[in-house]
Amino acid sequence: MATRNRTTVYRKHRDACKSARAPLSLSASDSFGGPVIEMVSGSFSRSNHSSYAPLNSYDPGPSSSDAFTIGMPPAWVDDSEEITFNIQKVRDKMNELAKAHSKALMPTFGDNKGIHREVEMLTHEITDLLRKSEKRLQMLSTRGPSEESNLRKNVQRSLATDLQNLSMELRRKQSTYLKRLQQQKEGQDEVDLEFNVNGKMSRLDEEDELGGMGFDEHQTIKLKEGQHVSAEREREIQQVLGSVNDLAQIMKDLSALVIDQGTIVDRIDYNVQNVSTSVEEGYKQLQKAERTQREGAMVKCATILLVLCLIMIVLLILKNILF
């Protein structure tokens, strides 16, 4: 059963209620005269199809007509949490699918239809979770205020990368499973062909012809079971091919977001390089300005005046000494 952790939301509401002053007295006449503490239900109320009723509390202070609002997280946060939860479920089911693949590929003498049905069911559930997460991911960029668009896009790209990695891993597992199924089918066909060459067995003979060739009832049943297993393998191969095609479409949709993320990273690198070039150019201009300031006319005039002042001081000293 799917569960969601609401401990953080509960603690937020509890702390907000504690911050309000406790009512000193409450009567029937003034029970609705105090401020209204509005518990604004955001995405949490949408997920549980319920809303909070206003809580009335009496405040004897001067701000008896004030009201404050306790905000909930935006709707897109719930979408991201649901996608994260689906990603974890996909990882768990992929582990179960790997075990089911191992059981289905083991040679058995009995009926293994239950294992094949389990593989089919797990593959269908994983594909549905990936499709559902992909739709939620596409809605993520359109929900919420425009001020949070950059944050939503970063979360969207991060989740898209995780979904694409899971899709690639599932596709790789399905391809490996399909290859081993085909190898088993080819091995069985080679055995049937060998029997045909030796004149001992024919897959296309009718039951009467088999009896005429000297096969007893037990051998005829075994032959029919082998044909049934071969048809079952063929059906599984077609099913795996279908799931691989579905995964290819999902990966195609997710690749746009991942490519967008790579484009932004390249753009950041380009901007960093431009900033580095601009800083170097600015440093050169600063050095040039410093040299210009040192070699300017004002500096030359000040130097000449200083030299003249020194000369005049020397002449004044000599005048006093000589005369």
Swiss-Prot record:
**Domain t-SNARE coiled-coil homology: from-to ranges:** 227-289
* Side of membrane Cytoplasmic, spans: 1-302
Q: Where in the cell is it found?
A: Golgi apparatus, trans-Golgi network membrane
Q: Name one GO molecular function term.
A: SNAP receptor activity
Q: Which keywords fit this entry according to its UniProt record? A: Golgi apparatus, Membrane, Plant defense, Protein transport, Transmembrane, Transmembrane helix, Transport
Answer whether the UniProt record assigns the keyword rRNA-binding to this protein.
no
Q: How does it sit in the membrane?
A: Single-pass type IV membrane protein
Please list the tissues where expression of this protein has been recorded.
Answer: Expressed at low levels in roots, stems, flowers and leaves.
Which is a Gene Ontology cellular component entry for this protein?
A: trans-Golgi network
Q: Which GO terms describe its biological process?
A: chloroplast organization; defense response to fungus; Golgi organization; Golgi to plasma membrane protein transport; Golgi to vacuole transport; intracellular protein transport; protein secretion; regulation of defense response to fungus
- Keyword DNA-binding found: no
Kindly list the residue ranges recorded as spanning the membrane.
303-323
Role summary: Contributes to the regulation of secretory and vacuolar transport pathways in the post-Golgi network, and to the maintenance of the Golgi apparatus and trans-Golgi network (TGN) morphologies. Vesicle trafficking protein that functions in the secretory pathway and mediates liposome fusion. Required for extracellular resistance responses to a fungal pathogen. Also involved in the protection of chloroplasts from salicylic acid-dependent biotic stress.
Q: How does it assemble?
A: Interacts with VTI12 and SYP61 to form a t-SNARE complex and with VPS45.
Family of this protein:
Belongs to the syntaxin family.
Name of this chain's protein: Syntaxin-42
The taxonomy runs: Eukaryota, Viridiplantae, Streptophyta, Embryophyta, Tracheophyta
Name of the gene encoding the protein in the UniProt record: SYP42
